[in-house]
A protein has these predicted regions:
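Cytoplasmic helix-loop-helix junction between adjacent transmembrane helices
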Residues: 120-158
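Helix-loop-helix hairpin linking two adjacent transmembrane segments in secondary transporters
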Residues: 153-200
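Juxtamembrane intracellular "pre-TM" segments in multi-pass secondary transporters
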Residues: 15-23, 201-234
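Intracellular juxtamembrane helix-capping segments at the cytosolic ends
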Residues: 130-142, 332-345
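Conserved MFS/SLC helix-loop-helix module at the cytosolic interface between two early adjacent transmembrane helices
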Residues: 76-114
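C-terminal transmembrane helical hairpin of 12-TM major facilitator-type secondary transporters
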Residues: 293-337
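Helix-to-loop junctions at the C-terminal end of transmembrane segments
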Residues: 78-89, 278-291, 375
Length: 403
């Protein structure tokens, strides 16, 4: 098999699974994929509850842009690494990317300056995009009538990683320091590498004559071909945008004299997002039975409601209620939109997922960076105005879809 042009598939070798929908997959594999998705995506969120500590430990405001840089790296990984999932053997790709992520995390932990932390964080984001190799792999292995539920389970694992990463980072940073948290992430990434090497079936991509360059060029063609992909991406840009705005600023908000809370509290708030974990499989099952569009409309309205709560109920109780509603809505929308895009062209799922997720994370990075600038200029009031404006746009997009 030549590089970039796999030959015809003669059938799976022992231990191999053809990379196509409908093949049976055991629960152990589903849960391994869910765990790996959570453990890998966690690495782009460890920094959020620790921003206050990092800002004090490294001079200047530059370090407060670590979440933005990390998300930019993640978006870059989606564009240049995730498309390989349609071209090369997925198990090997996932294992190698997890292993490289281990070394990138060590670079962040050891970086002596804000500039080097930013550079190393960019690499962490790039390699953590392996989480988006895992999600379409699960979709490809799942039978058609279980795809929504399987994707929902894997996405629940991914969301657990997002939520628990903040909790773990907040507690560890509060007790030991932010560098120690990144050092702890190193063996966690190494354990993920071992889990994937042990549990994943080998697979072969569908036969194709497309080179890697052609694969990347095809992303634009897929974007133009499928209006449903564009609609899903636009809607989720708004959802993930406000999600990024909130979690980027939360630790800084809690450190204000009004609350006087440290990274441990910021991390514990992450547990409240468990509502999103519940939303993932529920939304997947509803999408399978009644169609995903109803779920997406409901989620857009709930997201706007959560930001009205943040703006009007400025207390710990208001933050609690808003987080539960927002995380439930964002995750329900995500699972439903992915249910739509994964049905468009099965042999191009990795590339379709690349387009969708790259645009979503570029929007997240832009909103995160904007939120940081707004915070330094106008404080929490400015941030809530930003969140409400983006949420209103998300609701307006539902009206355009219906029209």
């Amino acid at each position: 098999m030549t590089e970039g042009a796999p030959g015809p598939v003669q059938g799976p070798a022992p231990g191999e699974t053809p990379d196509r929908a409908g093949e049976p997959m055991g629960k152990a594999v589903v849960f391994a994929l869910a765990a790996a998705a959570g453990l890998t995506v966690a690495n782009i969120y460890y920094n959020q509850p620790m921003l206050g500590l990092m800002e004090r430990g490294l001079s200047g405001h530059a370090v407060t842009y670590v979440p933005t840089v990390t998300q930019l790296g993640y978006a870059a990984g989606l564009l240049v690494l995730v498309p390989l999932g349609d071209l090369v053997e997925r198990k090997r790709l996932i294992v190698l990317q997890c292993l490289a992520l281990t070394f990138a995390l060590a670079l962040v932990a050891a970086a002596p300056s804000a500039g080097l932390v930013l550079c190393a964080s960019l690499v962490v984001g790039l390699l953590a995009s392996v989480a988006q190799q895992i999600v379409p792999f699960a979709a490809n292995l799942a039978p058609d009538d279980r795809r929504g539920a399987v994707v929902g389970t894997v996405m629940a694992g991914l969301l657990c990683g997002i939520l628990l990463s903040r909790t773990l980072a907040g507690i560890v940073a509060g007790l030991l320091g932010w560098r120690e948290m990144f050092w702890l992430a190193v063996p966690l990434a190494l354990a993920t590498t071992g889990l994937m090497a042990l549990m994943l079936p080998r697979s072969r991509p569908r036969p194709t004559d497309m080179s890697y360059g052609g694969l990347l060029a095809s992303l634009w063609s897929l974007w133009r071909e499928f209006p449903a992909l564009r609609r899903a991406a636009y809607v989720q840009c708004c959802q993930f945008g406000v999600f990024s705005v909130f979690w980027t600023i939360l630790a800084l908000r809690l450190e204000e004299p009004r609350f006087g809370l440290g990274p441990e509290a910021a991390g514990l708030f992450g547990i409240l997002g468990a509502a999103g974990v519940l939303a993932a499989p529920i939304a997947g099952r509803i999408a399978d039975r009644r169609g995903p569009r109803r779920v997406i409309v409901m989620a857009s309205v709930l997201t706007l409601a959560s930001w009205l709560v943040f703006a009007l109920w400025q207390s710990i109780a208001g933050l609690v209620v808003g987080i539960v509603v927002m995380d439930f809505a964002v995750q329900a929308s995500q699972v439903s939109n992915q249910s739509i895009i994964y049905a468009l062209r099965p042999e191009a799922r990795s590339r379709i997922n690349t387009v969708y997720m790259a645009i979503m994370f570029l929007a997240g990075a832009a909103c995160s960076g904007t939120a940081t600038a707004v915070w330094h200029g106008w404080g929490w009031s400015g941030v809530t105005v930003l969140g409400i404006a983006i949420s209103v746009l998300g609701v307006a997009l539902q009206g355009l879809r219906r029209g």
